[in-house]
Each structure stands twice: as structure tokens, then as C-alpha cells.
A protein has these predicted regions:
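Membrane-interface helix-loop junctions in multi-pass transporters/channels
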Residues: 1-132
């Protein structure tokens, strides 16, 4: 993982600077507050997947938006640790329906990222092009 996205992403990594740390921090606070207000990890995770799909699918790539929204906001909104805890709890109880529900949530998250990237592409195509 690079500071701006997964390996091979279109977002070039930036050298860490105080400005970038502040972008991540400023994005993290509203993300964490929204997660707390929602009180629903699956909804928070799906919303975060949709948003990071939009940000990562933007053209041209926007490294600062990825720091603020992708890493800061979505990173604190979503919860991999909570998802794994729910999975382990369901498995410990022998709840196949609980495990199936969590796997469904995982698939929905992937679809939300794909949808977000598609929305970003549509938004990019609908913007008027500047002539040089």
C-alpha cells in the first residue's frame, strides 16, 4: 500500500509532508463521526466503498483528494476490524447464516467500489472540456 492508494493504482504516491498529514487528519474526523452517528457498520462500510470508488475513479487522478477523502474519511468511516470481529463471532457460534451475511456484505462492498468508479467516469465525461 502506498500513501495514496494500492500498488498499481493510477494515483502516484506523494512524499509525506505536514500538509498531507493534515489532509488525512481532517478527513478522518468527519469519517469517524459519521461512523459513530450511523451506528451500523455494514452501512458505513458500503458508503465508504462507494465514496472511495468515486475518488479512486476520478479523472484526472487527484492525490490530495485521495489523502483527504480516500485515506482520511473512508479509512475512519469503514471498519475492517469490526467486520473481522463479526465474522469471527459468527464462526465461533457456528452461525452459517451470519458468515453468509458477512460474505454478502463483502461482495456488496466490491460492487459499491465498482459503482463508485462508474459514477466517477460518468461525471468526468459529463464535464465540459476546456479548449486550448
Amino acid at each position: 500500500m502506498t500513501p495514496c492508494g494500492p500498488e498499481g493504482s493510477r494515483v502516484a504516491p506523494l512524499p509525506p509532508r505536514p500538509e498531507e498529514l493534515l489532509l488525512v487528519a481532517f478527513g478522518a474526523v468527519p469519517g469517524a463521526l459519521l461512523r459513530w452517528l450511523l451506528q451500523a457498520d455494514p452501512l458505513a462500510n458500503l458508503l465508504g466503498c462507494l465514496v472511495i470508488g468515486i475518488v479512486s475513479g476520478s479523472e484526472p487522478p487527484r492525490p490530495r483528494a485521495m489523502l483527504l477523502v480516500g485515506i482520511g474519511f473512508c479509512g475512519s468511516l469503514t471498519t475492517f476490524s469490526g467486520w473481522i470481529l463479526a465474522l469471527e463471532t459468527a464462526m465461533g457460534r457456528g452461525s452459517l447464516s451470519g458468515v453468509a451475511l458477512l460474505l454478502l456484505e463483502l461482495a456488496a462492498g466490491v460492487l459499491a467500489v465498482v459503482l463508485g468508479r462508474g459514477l466517477a467516469g460518468r461525471l468526468a465525461r459529463s464535464r465540459p472540456r476546456l479548449r486550448r
